[in-house]
């Protein structure tokens, strides 16, 4: 049965339709891009973006600052979801278990506040998501006593983390393009199935910077490494361009669902064939809906909202109308979306419990991390 995907509600339908068209352009084969005045104008804009990016990168070299701590950056080359947040969680737990005093630094996209600060790990989540950003609020909820700090300028929030929490290792969430801060380890994530899209930089393509800039990375992590053929093809492409660059493959494993954010665990087997409505306001909502269908959930309707979208009263009404119209048992959303929801809605949704899994690459990845961080051990209390 084909899932009916609704592109948001009200004015957000136009935004999501435009977003879907842009993604089709970005991930089409380069040779299929037809000429014309509009495409020529977009190409010119893409060239201008690239020139501006290079200018900013060169300028940043002269004002880069170093924190008195080991700095690990988790970033990507393309816009959209590649799984930075699950890897950030994995790294924070790994380094903490190894005896490091870890702090996570996030920009706090879309937050209402402006001053750098620590994200509380408890409180009304929808309020915290508004003040600090949805991803930092989710990170703080998941990491508990591992501090998460937000701030536009990572050096300022990093100093705050070091002085307030005595952090000796900081993780930059989405840090590859943050040139103002020196880092000791740059990890870049790529989608194993289609790492570069059409190969162009914004706005003609999905790349934040050219492929050649992967030379700055210390290692590459291929996410969504599900199809062996895609992984092998992407590995071969990277090995040819960057022969000495370590490449690790990982995929996101669904451990189960929670009845409400942080609620009781619902086994996967109990979700099979149950009628459901889903919604997501993330960069690539279709991948989330496809995951649910792959689990054989009877997904009858799905709502795709703009990235970081905070549901309105109209959205909530549309969701409950869909549940009634489809005779659905379940209302499913992502963890990032759940932290933005008002309390009553957050308690009734089903939220997937996703983890990053390196499979056979895990031992090699752990050894790589240990080797890179050796000699920069935790400072004594």
UniProtKB/Swiss-Prot annotation:
<comment type="similarity">
    <text>Belongs to the LpxK family.</text>
</comment>
<comment type="pathway">
    <text>Glycolipid biosynthesis; lipid IV(A) biosynthesis; lipid IV(A) from (3R)-3-hydroxytetradecanoyl-[acyl-carrier-protein] and UDP-N-acetyl-alpha-D-glucosamine: step 6/6.</text>
</comment>
<keyword id="KW-0443">Lipid metabolism</keyword>
<comment type="function">
    <text>Transfers the gamma-phosphate of ATP to the 4'-position of a tetraacyldisaccharide 1-phosphate intermediate (termed DS-1-P) to form tetraacyldisaccharide 1,4'-bis-phosphate (lipid IVA).</text>
</comment>
<keyword id="KW-0067">ATP-binding</keyword>
<dbReference type="GO" id="GO:0009245">
    <property type="term" value="P:lipid A biosynthetic process"/>
</dbReference>
<dbReference type="InterPro" id="IPR027417">
    <property type="entry name" value="P-loop_NTPase"/>
</dbReference>
<keyword id="KW-0441">Lipid A biosynthesis</keyword>
<dbReference type="GO" id="GO:0005524">
    <property type="term" value="F:ATP binding"/>
</dbReference>
<dbReference type="GO" id="GO:0005886">
    <property type="term" value="C:plasma membrane"/>
</dbReference>
<protein>
    <recommendedName>
        <fullName>Tetraacyldisaccharide 4'-kinase</fullName>
        <ecNumber>2.7.1.130</ecNumber>
    </recommendedName>
</protein>
<keyword id="KW-0418">Kinase</keyword>
<keyword id="KW-0808">Transferase</keyword>
<dbReference type="Pfam" id="PF02606">
    <property type="entry name" value="LpxK"/>
</dbReference>
<feature type="binding site">
    <location>
        <begin position="78"/>
        <end position="85"/>
    </location>
    <ligand>
        <name>ATP</name>
    </ligand>
</feature>
<dbReference type="GO" id="GO:0009029">
    <property type="term" value="F:tetraacyldisaccharide 4'-kinase activity"/>
</dbReference>
<keyword id="KW-0444">Lipid biosynthesis</keyword>
<dbReference type="GO" id="GO:0009244">
    <property type="term" value="P:lipopolysaccharide core region biosynthetic process"/>
</dbReference>
<keyword id="KW-0547">Nucleotide-binding</keyword>
<dbReference type="InterPro" id="IPR003758">
    <property type="entry name" value="LpxK"/>
</dbReference>
């Amino acid at each position: 049965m084909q899932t009916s995907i609704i592109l948001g509600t009200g004015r957000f339908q136009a935004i999501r339709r435009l977003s879907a068209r842009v993604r089709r352009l970005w991930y089409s084969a380069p040779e299929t891009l037809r000429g014309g005045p509009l495409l020529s104008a977009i190409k010119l804009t893409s060239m201008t973006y690239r020139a501006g990016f290079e200018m900013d990168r060169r300028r940043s070299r002269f004002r880069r600052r170093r924190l008195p701590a080991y700095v690990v950056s988790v970033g990507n080359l393309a816009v959209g979801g590649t799984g930075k947040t699950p890897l950030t969680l994995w790294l924070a737990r790994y380094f903490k278990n190894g005896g490091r005093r870890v702090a996570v630094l996030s920009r706090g996209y879309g937050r209402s506040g402006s001053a750098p600060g620590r994200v509380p790990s408890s409180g009304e989540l929808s309020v915290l998501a508004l003040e600090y950003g949805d991803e930092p609020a989710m990170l703080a909820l998941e990491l508990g006593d591992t501090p998460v700090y937000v701030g536009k300028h990572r050096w300022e929030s990093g100093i705050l983390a070091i002085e307030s929490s005595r952090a000796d290792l900081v993780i930059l969430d989405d840090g590859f393009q943050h040139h103002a801060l020196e880092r000791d380890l740059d990890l870049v994530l790529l989608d194993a199935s289609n790492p570069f899209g059409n190969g162009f930089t914004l706005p003609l393509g999905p790349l934040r910077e050219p492929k050649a800039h992967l030379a700055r990375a210390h290692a590459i992590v291929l996410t969504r490494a599900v199809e062996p053929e895609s992984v092998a093809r992407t590995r071969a492409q990277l090995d040819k361009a960057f022969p000495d660059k370590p490449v690790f493959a990982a995929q996101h494993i669904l451990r189960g669902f929670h009845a409400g954010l942080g609620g009781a665990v619902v086994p996967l087997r109990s979700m099979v064939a149950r009628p459901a409505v889903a919604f997501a306001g993330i960069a690539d909502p279709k991948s989330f809906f496809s995951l649910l269908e792959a689990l054989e959930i009877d997904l009858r309707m799905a709502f795709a909202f703009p990235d970081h979208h905070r549901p309105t009263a109209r959205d909530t009404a549309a969701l409950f109308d869909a549940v009634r119209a489809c005779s659905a048992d379940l209302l499913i959303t992502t963890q990032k979306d759940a932290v933005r929801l008002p309390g009553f809605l957050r308690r009734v949704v089903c939220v997937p419990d996703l983890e990053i899994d390196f499979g056979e690459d895990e031992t090699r990845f752990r050894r790589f991390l240990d080797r890179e961080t050796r000699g920069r051990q935790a400072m004594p209390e």
